[in-house]
Amino acid sequence: MTKFNQLQTKDDFAKLLGLKSAKYINYLLYNIKTDNLYNSFTIPKKNGGERVIHAPKKELKFLQKKLSNVLWECYLESIESKSKDKNFKTPVLSHAFEKGKSIITNSQMHRNKKYILNIDLKNFFDSFNFGRVRGFFIKDRDFAVSPEIATVIAQIACYQGKLPQGAPSSPIITNLITRILDYRIVKIAKKYRFTYSRYADDLTFSTNRELNSNKLRASKELENFLTELEDLIISSGFEINPKKTRLSNNMQRQEVTGLVVNKKINVKREYVKNTRAMAFRLYKDGAFEIDKTPGTINQLTGRFAFIFQIEQYNNYLLYKKSLMQNNLDSQKYLLGRNSSRKSESKYYWKYIFYNKDLQKELLHNTKHHTYNLPTEFYSIGKEEKKTYMSLFNSREKEYKKFLFYKYFFGNDKPIIVTEGKTDPRYIKAALKNLYQKYPELIEKEGNNFIFKIEFLNRSNTIEYLFNVPEGGEGFKFWYNYFSDKFYYNEKKRKKIFCTKFRRKNFIHKLHYLFQTINQ
């Protein structure tokens, strides 16, 4: 039994959302009307066309967030109660809009398979109309609310009679309603030995079975599977988009939710090349385009971060494999850039091993008949390493170069690098108290403060890519990235990438900052 099963009145429902009474809900639903509380706009789709987004205004968004949080609690409570039943195993089927799940976890299930079948549900959010949402909360045993409360929930969640794409309550409601569809589909998938997962409206099936059309039996089984699947989807109130239905084998490029999954999870090569080309144009001309429209540095940051996220995931898998095998042949590839994955340990890029660097007779483990690396390999320590940049692959190097440009060359405001991570917090607090004395650094408009400077956010990504320690020693590291004497490859005498950027822009901002502080 969940909290929703115990609701009797609107006031009970309001208290469940954290409100004192139902007055605020009634005011939005019947005085203002929820259909008047949306801003609509369009965004371009990847494959052409436009996607309509209906974003709720803050009054309604506040209420929808409350509803979303309570529904998530009920959803997790339901899964937890079922997981205690030994006879019931909760399958991981939906990977969208849930914490700890993503397009990566969705793609991982279908990696390195012979055949992959991609199916798209047409007009996914439009399929959830007012009556369907209301009926679900009445009939579903985890909720089983009264018709009055079910109507209120549907009124809060729906716009123009259906779930809007852009409302914070829509994702969880779609997951709740499609949960029964997932369970029914997975039964059919198991019958024909397919692996199934869903990411919102993207349904993916994969198998290592032979589905060659020349083999009549396999071809007939595939036809039966598709027929049963289509009948189930249509009877559940959805429609298949035939334009996006495709079957691919392992001799072709196989994609799942935009990621390539043939051997390992990867970003499409065209996406990486286009991102690099955009960055090159930005470095050279100070501007670039995305789909023939001017791009922003934040858009490019998102593209690089997405590529980097996939690289980090693959590095993590390599690291796990190395630890599991625990032998010399696999551990020699365990570069320092993966060290942050090792429990509480920090980076240990200090030791890079190759066969020629090791004396195998000293590292032989007689008990397990393996060659283990010395314990010093796992030592925690940071030291200035001029060859550190050579540890990264080309994609990581490009992201590092871009971040350096973004923070020190392409920034609109002077940037301050502090000694510690928490220093910006105290400096900002001091500037807010002294804003009248330093109008060059901060201004106040109404109740809000506008900073004319920025602080470098020492995130895990910055720490990982730049190898800059905390404390005063970190300033020396940042200086090295601007020094003409600093090389990331001593043998080839390749200088650090800052020499490729326009240094005058940074020097001008640096002088401006020092003059302002001295005043």
Q: What residue spans do the PLM features occupy?
A:
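Short Gly/Ser/Thr- and Asp/Glu-enriched loop/turn motifs at secondary-structure junctions
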Residues: 197-201, 243, 411
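Short, flexible/disordered intra-domain loops and linkers
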Residues: 211-223, 463-474
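The start of beta-strands in P-loop NTPase/AAA+ ATPase cores
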Residues: 113-115, 196, 253, 414, ...
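Acidic, divalent-metal-binding catalytic cores of TOPRIM
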Residues: 339-340, 344-519
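Loop-centered beta-sheet repeat module
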Residues: 153, 159-188, 196-198, 204
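Right-hand nucleic-acid polymerase module
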Residues: 1-44, 52-77, 81-119, 124-127, ...
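Catalytic palm active-site di-aspartate
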Residues: 118-123, 166, 170, 192-214
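Active-site catalytic microenvironments for nucleophilic, acid-base chemistry
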Residues: 70-74, 139, 180, 184, ...
